[in-house]
């Protein structure tokens, strides 16, 4: 195509309007037209990455294949576009400032006074263009976190202003705002959007496209009013009303010609509108699945915020669609789970997920849930800490080591069936120091994991410091828990399963990060299938 085109997505009026979904939808529509697209997220917080952030603060921490702890929006990008993102796809203010300070310490600025303009803004611009320069993408979509008007966003907005001036038609700004509905007046109000656009204009940015988030449809008159007072073309005002599922948003945007408008404004041929056949088939199958009785699956964990397990929820949802059933996820707070109430808490559950996490809080409830599902032969899927809890519960109640534990929870345990990894022992810093990113795993032929994947060699993403202690491996296998997935370099146990049960698997890695709309993860598909079969019985 020639020069890379840059699309900036900003937000106004309120946070959590769905900039990530709009960015992903634009990317999907352009990708369907044959363009090579990637999406990056700029977060205005001063943390280097979200790796040490509490999930209640920021939702789940997503992990890229190259081992970067990233914003959960990267999960949306990957699920929608079916691409793999990297460290370069998620930048924070902390990383920008650290890079500038490191350069200053090296003497790269030759004694100049370091300022927000031009040094910070130049570093932001360099990172915006990095993906386009390095990988030759046709489009780089850049989502700016936060809301226009926030102090933290100002350097990013100034950088966008400069890039729009420098790049001309190769840069475009999409501004997402909120149009509230006042029930008392019975009407939608556009004034907040007008003020948000004026705020953007005050820093020198004229948005090219407006996406209006609303609970009710906008009339043509209302859209024309917004276009007139915000200085954009009529057809460049697009509504984004609430949809049944986020996966319908690309089709809603396409129906209003959003992708055509973007191409036209960037001087590119519009051509025929792509059919998005596989995407539409997925949605048709999803709608058909929703007409049936849902399959109930419990998610046992300590974070009751839905975004804390975002990728797991999406992976379960996708797996349900490909099993032609809607998955109803029931969160079960592990802090409140006891031997006395576990039967009631898991009543009616066709399958149980043991969620990932860190630390002692809520872990005893996970042991209770695992013991119950193991002894009642309920399909169970444990991820990361969930897999470690499966191993600990088995050691306590099957191997007979009542005081078995993880070194993370009890440094003095005499039976450390989960131990800290050797290379982690000398590490003191928390941020970015775990075993992160994609690693190889070899599956045991004939195992349920192997049957799910249909291949022997796989690669999955990790985020952990502790591992299964191979000193106990022979005892586990003799008692009925098999180690069926092994890293060929370190001999680290990646997958355990109990073959005698219907479906009882724990993975040290995070399979949810690799599940996409058009390619659901095989372990999740197999787990949901097992839950459906269990429900029949």
Curated annotation (Swiss-Prot):
Task: Give its E.C. classification number.
Answer: 6.3.4.2
**Pathway the protein contributes to:** Pyrimidine metabolism; CTP biosynthesis via de novo pathway; CTP from UDP: step 2/2
Example GO molecular function: glutaminase activity
Question: Is Ligase one of the keywords UniProt gives this record?
Answer: yes
Query: Any signal peptide, and if so, which residues?
Result: none
Q: How is its activity regulated?
A: Allosterically activated by GTP, when glutamine is the substrate; GTP has no effect on the reaction when ammonia is the substrate. The allosteric effector GTP functions by stabilizing the protein conformation that binds the tetrahedral intermediate(s) formed during glutamine hydrolysis. Inhibited by the product CTP, via allosteric rather than competitive inhibition.
- Catalytic activity, reaction form: UTP + L-glutamine + ATP + H2O = CTP + L-glutamate + ADP + phosphate + 2 H(+); L-glutamine + H2O = L-glutamate + NH4(+); UTP + NH4(+) + ATP = CTP + ADP + phosphate + 2 H(+)
Region: Amidoligase domain, residue numbers: 1-268
UniProt binding sites for UTP:
15, 189-194, 225
The residues that hold L-glutamine are 56, 357, 385-388, 408, 465
Where CTP binds, per the record, is at 15, 150-152, 189-194, 225
Tell me which residues bind Mg(2+). Answer: 73, 143
Assembly information from the UniProt record: Homotetramer.
Family membership, please give it: Belongs to the CTP synthase family.
Give the miscellaneous note: CTPSs have evolved a hybrid strategy for distinguishing between UTP and CTP. The overlapping regions of the product feedback inhibitory and substrate sites recognize a common feature in both compounds, the triphosphate moiety. To differentiate isosteric substrate and product pyrimidine rings, an additional pocket far from the expected kinase/ligase catalytic site, specifically recognizes the cytosine and ribose portions of the product inhibitor.
Q: What is this protein called?
A: CTP synthase
């Amino acid at each position: 195509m020639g020069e890379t085109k840059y699309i900036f997505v900003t937000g106004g009026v309120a946070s959590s309007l769905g900039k990530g979904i709009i960015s992903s939808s634009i990317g999907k529509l352009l990708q369907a037209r044959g363009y090579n697209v990637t999406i990056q997220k700029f977060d205005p917080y001063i943390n280097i990455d979200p790796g040490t952030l509490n999930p209640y603060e920021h939702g789940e921490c997503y992990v890229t294949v190259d081992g970067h702890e990233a914003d959960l929006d990267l999960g949306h990008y990957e699920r929608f576009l079916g691409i793999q993102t990297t460290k370069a796809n998620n930048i924070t203010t902390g990383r920008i400032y650290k890079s500038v300070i490191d350069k200053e310490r090296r003497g790269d600025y030759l004694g100049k006074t370091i300022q927000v303009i031009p040094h910070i803004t130049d570093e932001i611009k360099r990172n915006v263009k990095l993906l386009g320069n390095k990988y030759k993408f046709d489009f780089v979509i850049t989502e700016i976190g936060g809301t226009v008007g926030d102090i933290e966003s100002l350097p990013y907005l100034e950088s966008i202003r400069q890039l729009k001036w420098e790049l001309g038609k190769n840069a475009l700004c999409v501004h997402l705002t909120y149009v509230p509905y006042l029930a008392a007046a019975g009407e939608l109000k556009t004034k907040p959007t007008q003020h948000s656009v004026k705020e953007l204009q005050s820093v020198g940015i004229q948005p090219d496209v407006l996406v209006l988030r609303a609970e009710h449809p906008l009339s043509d008159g209302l859209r024309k009013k917004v276009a007139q007072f915000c200085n954009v073309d009529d057809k460049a005002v697009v509504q984004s009303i609430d949809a049944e599922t986020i996966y319908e948003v690309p089709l809603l945007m396409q129906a209003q010609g959003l992708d055509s408008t973007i191409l036209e404004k960037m001087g590119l041929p519009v051509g025929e509108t792509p059919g998005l056949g596989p995407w539409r088939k997925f949605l048709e199958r999803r709608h058909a699945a929703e007409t049936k009785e849902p399959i109930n699956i419990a998610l046992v964990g300590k974070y009751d915020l839905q975004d804390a397990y975002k990728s797991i929820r999406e992976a379960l949802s996708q797996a349900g669609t490909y099993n032609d059933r809607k998955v109803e996820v029931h969160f079960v707070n592990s802090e409140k789970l006891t031997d006395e109430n576990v039967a009631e808490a898991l009543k009616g559950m066709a399958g149980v997920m043991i969620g990932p996490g860190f630390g002692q809080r809520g872990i005893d409830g996970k042991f209770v849930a695992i013991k119950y599902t193991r002894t009642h032969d309920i399909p169970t899927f444990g991820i990361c800490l969930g897999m470690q809890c499966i191993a600990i519960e088995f050691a306590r109640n099957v191997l007979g080591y009542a005081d078995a534990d993880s070194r993370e929870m009890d440094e003095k345990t005499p039976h450390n069936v989960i131990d800290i990894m050797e290379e982690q022992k000398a590490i003191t810093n928390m941020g970015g120091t775990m075993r992160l990113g994609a690693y190889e795993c070899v599956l045991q032929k004939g195992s349920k994991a192997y049957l799910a994947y249909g291949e022997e060699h796989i690669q999955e993403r990790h985020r952990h410091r502790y591992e299964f202690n191979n000193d106990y491996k022979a005892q586990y296998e003799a008692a009925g828990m098999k180690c069926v997935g092994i890293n060929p370099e370190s001999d680290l146990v990646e997958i355990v399963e109990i073959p005698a049960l219907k479906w009882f698997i724990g993975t040290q890695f995070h399979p949810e990060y690799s599940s996409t709309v058009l390619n659901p993860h095989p372990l999740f598909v197999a787990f949901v299938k097992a839950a459906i079969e269990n429900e029949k019985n």
